[in-house]
């Protein structure tokens, strides 16, 4: 029997192929390098002049976007430290829907400055403690920098100003068009108590062709399909909705019928036809002009629906069916019957229209503010439309956040410079080694306006110097004007940042950086090989809000 020499160190406890990194040089520095490398890919996408990234994911779907959450999600990054920052951006996306780039860039800047402090002799724990003190101070100062509060969420002009900045960072040059569409859609569907606003009530229909400037918004719903029968339009229509197929039910058992002469053949389906006509006539007698069903329409039912001038629309998605019921005020029926009048929905116009080369069914509630609005997005390519959709989502989420907390800050990098100035002076007065980390926190905040200037092609050092001079002179709202390539008053130019979004971004970025700094060991088991990849959860409607 051959002698087996045991491994030395930590590897003796681990399986073959496991990896282990320990200490400042191996673990902490590796993590910092991974996170700064990640942020370097995202930094050029920050701000109105940010560059787009072209990402092709594992199923070869193409994304052209500058949205950090989308880029990081589709890259499928595996590094454990980088994953911590990605989880922070996912939380920001989930709670606010904007400022995801801010989280990545700020967290990486904090780690980059921490690497310098560690190299000078500070411990990661001291750096993390200093960062936490600085973040606490920043969150204390932030409420004093509020410049405006959104009060009237039913005023389209006012709402347009507030959501414009969220769109500008995604769709520069189209921000006015998109802001107008989103403001109209949000105000139309906003309930009496704006706190109860539901983002699921803003629907998006994407149709390739023309340009973004031809996009429209309407009060109602649009479905990318045609009508089933011959009737293609109904005005002032009562609508019956069925969750079952609009067809004859078939029994599971098969039967055999013996037909001996022509009369028996002629009379074979006469009773069936009479029954179907009776059902459709009863529906028509209730004033129904449109029938919507979740399944297919049988030929015989379609014949009699055409005879009684009833429009037939098929929706295959149960989620679309629920939203339509909410839009028109109908109660869905589980079987074919003539529903009572109070169970029917109503719509001013239901019509099949051709937009581009696509047939769509439009449920238009012209006469009233409805519960659901649809934004029809046009564009020259699928990736272009998808990016506009992401900008619309950000704007709608901004409106939602404003209904919860209406406080606004000056945008264009003004808040970051003011915070950096205040925290720098706070660090100068702080005792102990933490003061160096506090000052570095202030320098990390400068990274955000610096990225805006850099992506706009402006000299960064000169721009930051001018900004600091303005803020020291008491102009707290001085930000970067990328058009005139100089400083400006962000509030006068209606450039705002969400208070809630900025607050959460600072908190998440600091927490992510502190967590990574406090890791001194990385232990990775050998990856399992062979066998299929575990299946994820069954796909659901991504916009479903769990309605019953």
From Swiss-Prot:
Disordered as annotated region, ranges: 527-548
GO biological processes: protein folding
Q: Which CDD domains match?
A: TCP1_theta (cd03341)
Gene3D superfamilies this protein is in? Answer: GroEL, GroEL-like equatorial domain, TCP-1-like chaperonin intermediate domain
List the keywords (alphabetical): ATP-binding, Chaperone, Cytoplasm, Nucleotide-binding
Q: Name one GO cellular component term.
A: chaperonin-containing T-complex
* Loss of function: phenotype: Low and diffuse subcellular localization of pgl-1 in embryos rather than confined to granules in somatic cells.
Q: Where in the cell is it found?
A: Cytoplasm
Q: Which GO terms describe its molecular function?
A: ATP binding; ATP hydrolysis activity; ATP-dependent protein folding chaperone; unfolded protein binding
Per its database record, what is this protein's job? Molecular chaperone; assists the folding of proteins upon ATP hydrolysis. Known to play a role, in vitro, in the folding of actin and tubulin. Required for correct subcellular localization of pgl-1.
Subunit and interaction comment: Heterooligomeric complex.
Q: What is this protein called?
A: T-complex protein 1 subunit theta
